[in-house]
C-alpha cells in the first residue's frame, strides 16, 4: 500500500513539473512576441504630393530624403535631406541616405534616374499621378498601401469636404498661370497641373495651343488675353509684385492688365495634388470669384 502511495505521489510531482514547464515556455513566447522591436521604413519621396501624403498618414518621421518640390510640411526641412529636382537628380544622393523604400511619381522624373532606381535593389513604387480629384484620391490610397497604412480614407474625405466649398462661376474667367523664378518666366499650357487646377476652380486656362510650359513672350500674352494672371506667391514677389507684373511686355494690353487682376497662392499648396487639393481648389475658386467683382 505504501508503495502505491509513493508511486502516485511521484506521478503527481512529475505531471506538476511538466505543467509548470509548459506554462513557463508559453509565457516566454508571449513575452518575446510582445517585446519584438517594431521596424520602420527609411523613405525617400520624390514628389511634393507623395511627401504630403506620407506625412499626413503619420509617417513623416520615416522620410529621410525628398525632392525640391516637397516643401510641406515645413518641419521636413530639419529632418529630411533635399535631394534636388527629379529632372536633374542623380542616384548617388539617394543612395547616400540608405533608403529602404523609394516613392515617386511618373511625372517629370528623368528616365536615366528612373532606370537606376528600379535596378538599385531598393523597394521602389512609381505611381501614375492623374491631376484630378479622383486621381488624387486614388494616389492617396496607393501610397498608403505602399507604406502599410490602411487609415487613408480620412484624407480622401477631407478632400471631398473641401471641394464642397467651391462655388460655380457663371462666366469662366480665362486664367494665365505664369511661373516666375528669377529671370525665367514660363506659362502653363495644356495638360499641366495648373491647367487642371484652374479648371477645377471654375476657370479656363488661357493657353490651349501647346502643352506643358513654354517661355513667356509678349505675343503669347496678348494673344491669350487672360482675365486673370495667376502666380505662385514667391514668383509674384520675385517679379516685383503687382507693379512689376504690370510692366511686363504685353501685360498692359490684356484684360487682366487693364483691370489689375493679379492673384497669387502658395506654390506647394496649388501644385502638389495631394491631401490639400480640395483646400487649393476652394482657395483659387474664391480668388477667381473676387477678381470678377
Question: PLM features: residue spans?
Answer:
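Sec-dependent bacterial lipoprotein signal peptides
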Residues: 1-15
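Bacterial lipoprotein signal-peptidase II cleavage site
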Residues: 17-25
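Basic- and aromatic-lined ligand-binding clefts that recognize polyanionic substrates
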Residues: 36-57, 150-203
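Structured C-terminal subdomain patch of bacterial secreted/periplasmic proteins
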Residues: 41-42, 134-147, 154, 170, ...
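A short, structured surface patch at a secondary-structure boundary
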Residues: 42-97, 101-107
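His/Asp/Glu-enriched short active-site or ligand-binding loop at hydrolase and phosphoryl-transfer sites
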Residues: 67, 190-213, 233
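Proline-aspartate-enriched helix->loop->beta-strand connector
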Residues: 90-107, 122, 217-234
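Extracytoplasmic ligand-binding site segments that recognize negatively charged/polar headgroups
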Residues: 112, 129-141, 176-193, 237-240
Amino acid at each position: 500500500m505504501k508503495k502505491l502511495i509513493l508511486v502516485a505521489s511521484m506521478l503527481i510531482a512529475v505531471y506538476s513539473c511538466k505543467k509548470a514547464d509548459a506554462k513557463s515556455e508559453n509565457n516566454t513566447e508571449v513575452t518575446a512576441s510582445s517585446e519584438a522591436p517594431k521596424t520602420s521604413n527609411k523613405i525617400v519621396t520624390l514628389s511634393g504630393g507623395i511627401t504630403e501624403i506620407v506625412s499626413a498618414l503619420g509617417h513623416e518621421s520615416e522620410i529621410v530624403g525628398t525632392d525640391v518640390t516637397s516643401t510641406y510640411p515645413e518641419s521636413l526641412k530639419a529632418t529630411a535631406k533635399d535631394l534636388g529636382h527629379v529632372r536633374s537628380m542623380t542616384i548617388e544622393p539617394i543612395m547616400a541616405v540608405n533608403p529602404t523604400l523609394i516613392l515617386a511619381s511618373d511625372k517629370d522624373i528623368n528616365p536615366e534616374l528612373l532606370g537606376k532606381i528600379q535596378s538599385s535593389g531598393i523597394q521602389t513604387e512609381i505611381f501614375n499621378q492623374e491631376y484630378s480629384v479622383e486621381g488624387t484620391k486614388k494616389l492617396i490610397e496607393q501610397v498608403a498601401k505602399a507604406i502599410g497604412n490602411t487609415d487613408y480614407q480620412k484624407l480622401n474625405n477631407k478632400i471631398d469636404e473641401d471641394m464642397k466649398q467651391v462655388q460655380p462661376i457663371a462666366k469662366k474667367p480665362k486664367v494665365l498661370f505664369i511661373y516666375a523664378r528669377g529671370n525665367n518666366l514660363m506659362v502653363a499650357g495644356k495638360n499641366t497641373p495648373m491647367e487642371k487646377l484652374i479648371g477645377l476652380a471654375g476657370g479656363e486656362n488661357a493657353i490651349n495651343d501647346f502643352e506643358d510650359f513654354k517661355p513667356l513672350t509678349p505675343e503669347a500674352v496678348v494673344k491669350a488675353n487672360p482675365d486673370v494672371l495667376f502666380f505662385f506667391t514667391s514668383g509674384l514677389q520675385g517679379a516685383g509684385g503687382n507693379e512689376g507684373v504690370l510692366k511686363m511686355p504685353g501685360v498692359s494690353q490684356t484684360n487682366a492688365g487693364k483691370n489689375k487682376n493679379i492673384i497669387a497662392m502658395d506654390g506647394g499648396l496649388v501644385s502638389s495634388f495631394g491631401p490639400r487639393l480640395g483646400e487649393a481648389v476652394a482657395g483659387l475658386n474664391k480668388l477667381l470669384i473676387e477678381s470678377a467683382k
